[in-house]
């Protein structure tokens, strides 16, 4: 059995830049997604106890769904609203991975609402970040489910 001191020494040590990909971030100036990305990169660096490659970010369609491109981890940019379904499949096949779903209010609650509900019903170990920008950022013709007033 490995003594506790050895386990601490074998734990990977990361800094925020270890989770920053080389991709140019393509969000509008002032977008709140920048803050979410920065906090996630810093949080994973501070608290992860596993290899960086064991984190997977899965997204659908929308502004926030470009997230996997900006994380230096594995990731999928999937089809509109289906990220929870794909994440469920991945977690079932590879339960050792830390699987994150990043989705927006339109992607995750409009077209993907049923997939989100079923992922929660299945109660598997997914981590879901739902970004609520309260605007139809990608499709300006539709209101999303969390919009409090008509725009």
Where are these regions (language model features)?
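Context-gated lysine
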Residues: 11, 16, 42, 51, ...
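Short capping/connector residues at structural and topological boundaries
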Residues: 32, 114, 141-143
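Long, contiguous secondary-structure blocks with strong helical propensity
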Residues: 6, 40-58, 94-96, 113-124
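Active-site diphosphate/adenylate-binding microenvironment
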Residues: 11-13, 17-79
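Thiamine diphosphate
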Residues: 5-6, 63-151
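Flexible, glycine/proline-enriched loop segments at strand-loop-helix junctions
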Residues: 26-30, 102-106, 151
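Short, charged low-complexity linear segments at domain edges
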Residues: 1-15
């Amino acid at each position: 059995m490995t003594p506790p001191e050895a386990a601490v020494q074998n734990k990977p040590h990361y800094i925020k830049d270890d989770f920053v990909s080389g991709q140019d971030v393509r969000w509008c100036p002032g977008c709140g997604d920048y803050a979410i990305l920065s906090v996630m990169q810093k949080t994973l660096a501070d608290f992860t106890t596993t290899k960086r490659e064991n984190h997977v970010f899965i997204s659908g369609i929308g502004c926030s769904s470009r997230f996997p491109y900006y994380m230096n981890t594995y990731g999928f940019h999937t089809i509109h609203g289906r990220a929870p379904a794909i994440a469920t499949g991945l977690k079932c096949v590879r339960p050792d991975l830390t699987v994150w779903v990043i989705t927006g209010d339109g992607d995750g609650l409009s077209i993907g609402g049923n997939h989100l509900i079923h992922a929660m019903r299945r109660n598997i170990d997914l981590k879901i970040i739902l970004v609520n920008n309260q605007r139809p950022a990608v499709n300006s013709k539709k209101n999303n489910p969390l919009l409090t007033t008509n725009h």
